[in-house]
């Protein structure tokens, strides 16, 4: 079984507020488990969320100019 993190623990690992994590859950941008009234986030799902937002060195967004 994967380690389940509370919203507080997930926020601490992300370095963000609990409110941000709750918004991710509400917007269904991160997978979560509901245990009664409690929300838990699997550590592997949190890691996947972090990896999905990773920007590799040397990748620049394409800028459109003019028009």
Where are these regions (language model features)?
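The DNA-recognition helices of helix-turn-helix-type DNA-binding domains
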Residues: 28-29, 53
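Secondary-structure transition/capping residues
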Residues: 21, 32, 57-61
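Short Lys/Arg-enriched helix C-cap and helix-to-coil transition segments
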Residues: 33-38
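Short amphipathic alpha-helical segments
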Residues: 22, 40-41
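Polyanion-binding surface elements
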Residues: 1-23, 52
